[in-house]
A protein has these predicted regions:
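The DNA-contacting recognition helix of HTH DNA-binding domains
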Residues: 33, 44, 54-55, 73
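Hydrophobic micro-packing sites on short alpha-helices
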Residues: 61-66, 76
C-alpha cells in the first residue's frame, strides 16, 4: 500500500486550528461559551464562530479570548500548528499499489 496526502484544501486552516484550541480549552475547563465571551468582550455567537473556524479573528481578538481563558497567546500559537500537522497526518489516504 502507498500513502498519498489528501488534497491541500482538506487541511485545516489556521483559524480552524486556533478555534479548536479555544474550544478544547473551554470544554476541558467546563466553561460556558457565554461566560468566556463576556470576559473576552465578544458576543457568544462570535466566539462560537471563532471556535468553529468560521470567523478569522484578529490578533486583538485572539489576545482577548486567550486572556478570558487564562491561556497565554504563545500557547495558542504553539498548539494551533500542531493541530494542523495532526490533521495532515490523519489525512493520508491508503491507496492499493
Amino acid at each position: 500500500m502507498i500513502a498519498v496526502a489528501a488534497a491541500p484544501g482538506d487541511r485545516p486552516l489556521m483559524r480552524e486550528a486556533i478555534g479548536e484550541v479555544f474550544r478544547t480549552t473551554r470544554h476541558h475547563r467546563s466553561e460556558r461559551i457565554s461566560d468566556v465571551a463576556r470576559r473576552a468582550n465578544v458576543s457568544p455567537q462570535y466566539l462560537s464562530e471563532v471556535e468553529r473556524g468560521v470567523k478569522d479573528p484578529s490578533s486583538e481578538i485572539v489576545e482577548s479570548i486567550s486572556t478570558a481563558l487564562d491561556l497565554p497567546v504563545s500557547d495558542v500559537l504553539r498548539q494551533a500548528p500542531r493541530r494542523i500537522d495532526t490533521h495532515q497526518v490523519s489525512n493520508f489516504l491508503p491507496v492499493a499499489a
